[in-house]
């Protein structure tokens, strides 16, 4: 899980320009990290590329926090 979290954190920091310390499992992309809808779509696309997977639109809508993203990726691998 640590490797997945590190990779997800790097993508979030690069995409949203937030401090790495703010990227916690419970952090919401929109409320806590300041992402808008387009940012979230782009994050999902980057996660798909990074982890060589496809995330359906239905599943993407359920990914609201950093922890949601990490858990989803872990469960798909």
Swiss-Prot record:
Query: Which PROSITE patterns does its entry note?
Result: CARRIER, PHOSPHOPANTETHEINE
Processing and modification events after translation:
4'-phosphopantetheine is transferred from CoA to a specific serine of apo-ACP by AcpS. This modification is essential for activity because fatty acids are bound in thioester linkage to the sulfhydryl of the prosthetic group.
All copies of the Carrier domain together span: 2-77
Q: Is the Cytoplasm keyword given for this protein?
A: yes
Q: In which pathway does it act?
A: Lipid metabolism; fatty acid biosynthesis
O-(pantetheine 4'-phosphoryl)serine occurs at 37
Top-level taxon: Bacteria
* Record bears the keyword Lipid biosynthesis: yes
SUPFAM superfamilies listed in its UniProt record: ACP-like (SSF47336)
In alphabetical order, the GO MF annotations are: acyl binding; acyl carrier activity
Q: Name one GO cellular component term.
A: cytosol
Name the keywords, alphabetized: Cytoplasm, Fatty acid biosynthesis, Fatty acid metabolism, Lipid biosynthesis, Lipid metabolism, Phosphopantetheine, Phosphoprotein
Principal location listed in the UniProt entry: cytoplasm
Do you know which Pfam families this protein is assigned to? Answer: PP-binding
Q: Which GO terms describe its biological process?
A: lipid A biosynthetic process
InterPro entries cross-referenced by the UniProt entry? ACP, ACP-like_sf, PP-bd_ACP, Ppantetheine_attach_site
UniProt family annotation: Belongs to the acyl carrier protein (ACP) family.
Its annotated function is as follows: Carrier of the growing fatty acid chain in fatty acid biosynthesis.
- The entry's protein name is Acyl carrier protein
Species source reads Bacillus subtilis (strain 168)
């Amino acid at each position: 899980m640590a490797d997945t979290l590190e990779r997800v954190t790097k993508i979030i920091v690069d995409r949203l320009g937030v401090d790495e310390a703010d990227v916690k499992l419970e952090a919401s992309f929109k409320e806590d990290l300041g992402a808008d809808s387009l940012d979230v779509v782009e994050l999902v696309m980057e996660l798909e590329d990074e982890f060589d997977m496809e995330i359906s639109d239905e599943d993407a809508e359920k990914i609201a926090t950093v922890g949601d993203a990490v858990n989803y990726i872990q469960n798909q691998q």
